[in-house]
Amino acid sequence: MKAIVFAYHDIGCVGINALTKAGFDIQAVFTHTDDPNENHFFSSVARLSADLALPVFAPENVNHPLWIERIRELKPDVIFSFYYRDMLSEDILSLASTGAFNLHGSLLPKYRGRAPINWAILNGEVETGVTLHKMVLKPDAGDIIAQYKVAIAETDTALTLHGKIREAAEKLFDQVLPQIKAGIYPAIPQDESQATYFGRRTAVDGEIDWHKSATEINNLVRAVTEPYPGAFTFLGERKITIWRACPLNETHDKQPGTVLSVDPLIIACGKGTLEIINGQSESGLYVQGHRLAVDMSMVTDVRVGPKATTQINHRKRVLILGVNGFIGNHLTERLLRDGNYDIYGMDIGSSAIERFISNPRFHFIEGDINIHTEWIEYHIKKCDVVLPLVAIATPIEYTRNPLRVFELDFEENLKIVRYCVKYNKRIIFPSTSEVYGMCDDKEFDEDDSRLIVGPINKQRWIYSVSKQLLDRVIWAYGEKEGLKFTLFRPFNWMGPRLDNLNSARIGSSRAITQLILNLVEGSPIKLVDGGEQKRCFTDINDGIEALFRIIENREGLCDGQIINIGNPTNEASIRQLAEILLDSFEDHELRDHFPPFAGFKKVESGSYYGKGYQDVEHRKPSIKNAERLLDWKPTIDMKQTINETLDFFLRGAVEELGKN
């Protein structure tokens, strides 16, 4: 039976060995690039695959059409996923004739999602296990094929429990893989009423809340001790990591976090006390508790807890959905640079925001707004400002996937708007210059211009009207129920990290990225309808500065406002954009790495975008509102933006060439 395997970590190695033992014909293994911090503790799927002479790949996006086609060509009978960290698309899951199976580290339907072992210890569970289940589009929700239970001891840590889970997985595979190979296996539907979901944990989640009971705090210590970053607290500004502790059933009359004794080191909790067995200062060694107290100059009755400065300054909390996108990642950079914001972000990937992951003011979860509704509602309730930036915003998708555009851009975002109403939170909503449609004004004005779109059979307008309808709904909630909002309308923002060349290869990108791909691959630059359409191109840094000032909202000037953010002086046709880009390409220091220019090629919009497309001849913003409300004007010339964008993509392309 031919198998494709998606695997990572120790469990991935266990799964591959079990499949080999059971006689499966492994056609290919997909994994992730090894993290040396993890491989110090856990085995490498890539190395095991190499030792077994199995084809192994580590694509950045396995759901890309190119990889889907390669998997289709292998004609797998079955697909297995063992601790692979990316969600597999329906297109991949449908390729296996026998089905797709995933091993999950809990007794489903409990503890769906990420880090189930850590969460089980944290929540004080006494039992967990492993589950092999059928894979469906919703994560961890398919029919259960087999389970194996594991007891959690009071002394178990995430590492020791992982060892038990590994042994349980081996036993489960020995039992069930022959059944799958024979095509005779049970499939029990999950009880959705019993389902629980937990998201990804990050290092900042290890901060100790001393108001909790000693048992709860000790569970946190056990859940995140080595090889994880550890549970931590602060003595003033100095960080203390607690690696091992013991809860004591002692009563006291002190404030939580008070040091009751230094030898042994005992700290008061909301209920009971906690003896610190081993710990470490930020710059010190792993030591016993009483030695830690000496190193930190602790005395009886001193208090540990949150970092001193965080108790003084309350930073504004900003929720960004779609944080890995073009606007999201640049906005995150600007907010972190300011220093007065904590950012909570969600996206289905993290390629553009890896540079922020270690920042303590950036909190990221990998997830899908279609699925992680509980997480979203909780963080809307928790945060001060909400920016729902998730949308399909590439023209070819408007005609290729109009219903998906409507479902994501309107229906899913409407849920977020209603949560903001429910919890009285400020929403900054990304409208679009597309809402103006075929407006015949010389400049598009937020307050007076007509919003004109084409006939129903021109499906490209589904994006425009989805956004426009949400604009109207948000405005109505503001008028009738007091929703605090600002609508901003970007006009052709561009710069580094706008889409990527892989998305351009399947036509799902904005204009400049598509043009750069043509230059990189030596294919003709296609000018849709001759490229005579005019746009006003705005540098991402100009755009983000305006958006940052909307978030600041000094004196509340942006409340209830619609604000165009564009650069009217950077007006050019698509053909002119292509010509400037070509000149910059020919002058670039990396030019010799790429094929000769293949010329311009005029194509009709119908053949390029498909049936149902209709274009707009010009789109120039009035920016009076931005000037008046934000004290903002764009300053960056289009040629500078083109040069920086081209340089970013060319260096990335050369780096890829070096890998291949």
UniProtKB/Swiss-Prot annotation:
Its EC number is 2.1.2.13, 1.1.1.305. It catalyses: UDP-alpha-D-glucuronate + NAD(+) = UDP-beta-L-threo-pentopyranos-4-ulose + CO2 + NADH; UDP-4-amino-4-deoxy-beta-L-arabinose + (6R)-10-formyltetrahydrofolate = UDP-4-deoxy-4-formamido-beta-L-arabinose + (6S)-5,6,7,8-tetrahydrofolate + H(+). UDP-alpha-D-glucuronate binds at residues 393, 398, 432-433, 460, 492, 526-535, 613. Pathway: Nucleotide-sugar biosynthesis; UDP-4-deoxy-4-formamido-beta-L-arabinose biosynthesis; UDP-4-deoxy-4-formamido-beta-L-arabinose from UDP-alpha-D-glucuronate: step 1/3; Nucleotide-sugar biosynthesis; UDP-4-deoxy-4-formamido-beta-L-arabinose biosynthesis; UDP-4-deoxy-4-formamido-beta-L-arabinose from UDP-alpha-D-glucuronate: step 3/3; Bacterial outer membrane biogenesis; lipopolysaccharide biosynthesis. InterPro entries: Arna-like_SDR_e (IPR045869), Bifun_polymyxin_resist_ArnA (IPR021168), Epimerase_deHydtase (IPR001509), Formyl_trans_C (IPR005793), Formyl_transf_N (IPR002376), Formyl_transf_N_sf (IPR036477), Formyl_transferase-like_C_sf (IPR011034), Lipid_A_modif_metabolic_enz (IPR050177). The keyword Lipid metabolism applies. Signal peptide: none annotated. Gene3D superfamilies: 3.40.50.12230, NAD(P)-binding Rossmann-like Domain. The record marks D140 as: Raises pKa of active site His. (6R)-10-formyltetrahydrofolate binds at R114, V136, L137, K138, P139, D140. The record marks N102 as: Transition state stabilizer. Keywords: Antibiotic resistance, Lipid A biosynthesis, Lipid biosynthesis, Lipid metabolism, Lipopolysaccharide biosynthesis, Multifunctional enzyme, NAD, Oxidoreductase, Transferase. Residues 314-660 are annotated as: Dehydrogenase ArnADH. GO terms for cellular component: membrane. One of its GO terms (biological process) is lipopolysaccharide biosynthetic process. One of its GO terms (molecular function) is carboxy-lyase activity. The active site is at H104 (proton donor), E434 (proton acceptor), R619 (proton donor). Homohexamer, formed by a dimer of trimers. HAMAP family: ArnA. This is Bifunctional polymyxin resistance protein ArnA. The gene is arnA.
